From Swiss-Prot:
Alphabetized UniProt keyword annotations: Cytoplasm, Nucleus, Ribonucleoprotein, Ribosomal protein
Location(s) in or outside the cell: Cytoplasm; Nucleus
Main localization category: cytoplasm
Gene: rpl901
Organism placement in taxonomy: Eukaryota, Fungi, Dikarya, Ascomycota, Taphrinomycotina
Name by which UniProt lists this protein: Large ribosomal subunit protein uL6A
GO annotation terms (biological process): cytoplasmic translation
């Protein structure tokens, strides 16, 4: 297999969003706030031309060419984050012992009590920019919201992971906190 001499991908920047690229440090600013991402470790040429960004790889191998789409997706998710935001909904699942959730420090720290009847309190600090709220419409549901997809999804994963059932048959003990729905905070009007 030979190498591709040139491969590129183009991302269009929507109105109301500004993207700054300096030495592969990307800053995206929109109506919901600002997100920054350091992409210096990726050997890709990024050029901003008007309202588009062009990602270029010269003489790239198969894995090097795959980096183009990864960087494209990262920056596209940042643009969606500063325009619409991200929301994850998680459901509390229990058979016998009801799981209690307390939110502290303005919804950035989650305390889980009475998981499988245990007396231990499990504490999860959410990543920066993520706020947690308890749903008023649905019983036993928490909502994670933020601008950064990476931070919101990793915070949801941390909450799910701390409630793993150990030393028991997981087919029988289905207790835990699971992601039930994910999407955007503000849906675009078509």
């Amino acid at each position: 297999m030979g190498r591709d001499i040139y491969k590129d991908e183009t991302l269009t920047i929507p109105k109301g969003v500004t993207v700054d690229i300096k030495a592969r440090n990307v800053t995206v600013t929109g109506p919901r706030g600002t997100l920054k991402q350091n992409l210096r470790h990726v050997d890709i040429e990024m050029k901003k031309q008007g309202n588009t960004i062009k990602f270029i790889v010269w003489h790239g191998s198969r894995k090097h060419n795959a980096c183009i789409r990864s960087v494209y997706s990262i920056i596209n998710n940042m643009i969606i984050g500063v325009t619409q935001g991200f929301r994850y909904k998680m459901r509390l699942v229990y058979a016998h012992f009801p799981i209690n959730i307390n939110l502290t420090e303005n919804g950035t720290v989650v305390e889980i009590r009475n998981f499988l009847g245990e007396r231990i309190t499990r504490v999860i600090k959410c990543l920066p920019g993520v706020t947690v709220s308890i749903s008023s419409a649905v019983k036993d549901e928490i909502i994670l919201e933020g601008n950064s997809l990476e931070n919101v999804s990793q915070s949801a994963a941390n909450i799910k992971q701390i409630c793993n059932v150990r030393n028991k048959d997981i087919r029988k003990f289905l207790d835990g906190i699971y992601v039930s729905e994910r999407g955007n905070i503000e849906e675009l009007e078509e």
